[in-house]
Swiss-Prot record:
Substrate binds at Y24, Y129, R164, R278. One of its GO terms (molecular function) is FMN binding. InterPro entries: Aldolase_TIM, Alpha-hydoxy_acid_DH_FMN, FMN-dep_DH, FMN_HAD, FMN_hydac_DH_AS, LldD. GO terms for biological process: aerobic respiration; lactate metabolic process. It is a peripheral membrane protein. Its main location: membrane. This is L-lactate dehydrogenase. GO terms for cellular component: plasma membrane. CDD domains: alpha_hydroxyacid_oxid_FMN. It is an enzyme of class 1 (oxidoreductase). Residues 1-380 form the FMN hydroxy acid dehydrogenase domain. Its cofactor is FMN. Belongs to the FMN-dependent alpha-hydroxy acid dehydrogenase family.
């Protein structure tokens, strides 16, 4: 298969993965309207082309939370990444480090913190959920500190799991799920050998280390489902802000008032995110929510954005809408599933090339210059229709 654009990796991943894994990463909540709008709304963002601007000197690097990034991109936390490639979190982290950007390890990763952190030279980020088991949360924070994690990404948009109907059809959940997954693995021998056999153990490393026993896929679903905490409020996060002395980012913000609450809480950054359309179907796409949030809190903390980003052009669009940086989730998992570390490195190379083209043709010499001025007048007027 010819890979000429970041989007090509999706088809490559689908060909390689058992359906339960492909649809788990590819799908969204309910009828998946928000999942689709994340992509389509971002594609509708029209940029303002400029010419004769002497674009011989482009600078993609940026500073974020005391780190220098080769470009304003980080790999997002994605659960079960180690099921998409052999020891997938390690491969993805190495790819990110090789391209000079951060990797964010998920709470529900296959590879534990202690396996991933020593595999790379640059510090990684760590994502944590709000869970009823505060002992687990404290244990995870202590281990992250000990491993040299610099930035904590705190996910707050999962007080309850989203209804992901596609999972029941694909075999991730639903009737006879274990049998269906086994049969799918048999019909995908490359994955079964490389990941299914050579990629063991497949337990949830961070959770297993705390529980003292292996945590397989079925155990994970039950444990996590029992630990979602719908009673959580801002006051319940105060002990974490006191415990964690490094940068702290609140992930899952879609409303300007919640963004202002994050500022009052003392967060160093937020991620404008609808969890990739995997939680509440029918909410705003990140691209539609971002301008009002940027109007409300820009300059008071760092604004990151995710959901729907499939190219370097999309990265520039998000920056023009008000983000300081973006997180890539599905896009890197597709590349990882298709070609491992090399696939993710190539994906990031493609993202960088596409950013350079977009910046050259919008007359923006550096990341700091990418602003609403890079948007077409029509797009600016549309963004202004959603007020904070």
């Amino acid at each position: 298969m010819i890979i000429s654009a970041a989007s090509d990796y999706r088809a490559a991943a689908q060909a390689r993965l058992p359906p339960f894994l492909f649809h788990y990463i590819d799908g969204g909540a309910y009828a998946e309207h928000t999942l689709r709008r994340n992509v389509s709304d971002l594609a509708d963002v029209a940029l303002r082309q400029r010419v004769l601007r002497n674009m011989s000197d482009l600078r993609l690097s940026t500073e974020l939370f005391g780190e220098t990034l080769a470009m304003p991109v980080a790999l997002a936390p994605v659960g079960l990444t180690g099921m998409y490639a052999r020891r997938g979190e390690v491969q993805a982290a190495r790819a990110a480090a090789a391209r000079g950007i951060p990797f964010t390890l998920s709470t529900v990763s296959v590879c534990p913190i202690e396996e991933v952190a020593p595999a790379i030279e640059r510090p990684m980020w760590f994502q944590l959920y709000v869970l009823k088991d505060r002992g687990f949360m404290r244990n995870a924070l202590e281990r992250a500190k000990a491993a040299g994690v610099t930035t904590l990404v705190f996910t707050v948009d999962m007080p309850t799991p989203g209804a992901r109907y596609r999972d029941a059809h694909s075999g991730m959940s639903g009737p006879n799920a274990s049998l269906r997954r086994m049969l799918q693995a048999v019909t995908h021998p490359r994955w079964a050998w490389d990941v299914g056999l050579l990629g063991r153990p497949h337990d949830l490393g961070n959770i297993s280390a705390y529980r003292g026993s292996p945590t397989g896929l079925q155990d994970y679903i039950g444990w996590l489902g029992a630990n979602f905490d719908p009673s959580i409020a801002w006051k319940d996060l105060e002990w974490i802000r006191e415990f964690w002395t490094g940068p702290m980012v609140i992930k899952g913000i879609l409303d300007p008032e919640d963004a202002r609450d994050a500022v009052r809480f003392g967060a160093d950054g937020i991620v404008v995110s609808n969890h990739g359309g995997r939680q509440l179907d029918g909410v705003l796409s990140s691209a539609r929510a971002l301008p009002a949030i940027a109007d409300a809190v820009k300059g008071e903390l760092k604004i990151l954005a995710d959901s729907g980003i499939r190219s370097g052009l999309d990265v520039v669009r998000m920056l023009a809408l008000g983000a300081d940086a973006v997180l890539l989730g599905r896009a890197f998992v597709y590349a990882l599933a298709a070609a491992g570390q090399a696939g993710v490195e190539n994906l990031l190379t493609l993202i960088e090339k596409e950013m350079r083209v977009a910046m050259t043709l919008t007359g923006t010499h550096s990341i700091a210059e990418i602003s609403a001025d890079a948007l077409s007048r029509v797009t600016r007027e549309r963004a202004e229709t959603i007020s904070p």
